[in-house]
Amino acid sequence: MKPLLDVLVILDALEKEGSFAAASAKLFKTPSALSYTIHRLESDLNIQLLDRSGHRARFTPSGQMLLEKGREVLHIARELEIRAVKLQQGWEHTLRLA
């Protein structure tokens, strides 16, 4: 599900940047677009990812877990993309003999 990767990128930026405004500037999207995307995932999964009761949104335990595991998924997705490009360009895997 591609939109899930988009949400993971948004959650990562939100945690790193500290606010919807800063995350939206980094991702070249509006704060309302980020908020809507996160809210839609919360509705789809029937969980709350962010506690919005204070001045700044904070990750709930579920949100923190999704952020941490999501970062692993993003890392693997980036690695997969890099490997696919290298393979297409003729790079081969290396074999190490000990």
Where are these regions (language model features)?
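Short helix-coil-helix linker/hinge
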Residues: 1-6, 90
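Alpha-helical linker/hinge and terminal dimerization helices associated
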Residues: 7, 44-45, 66-88
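Short helix-boundary/capping micro-motifs
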Residues: 12-28
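Residue cluster at the C-terminal edge of the helix-turn-helix DNA-binding motif
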Residues: 17, 26, 40-48
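Helix-turn-helix DNA-binding elements, focusing on the entry/boundary residues of the two helices
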Residues: 19-20, 38, 52
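A short LG(V/I)-centered, amphipathic sequence patch enriched
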Residues: 42-61
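Interdomain hinge and pocket-entrance segments immediately C-terminal to HTH DNA-binding domains
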Residues: 85-98
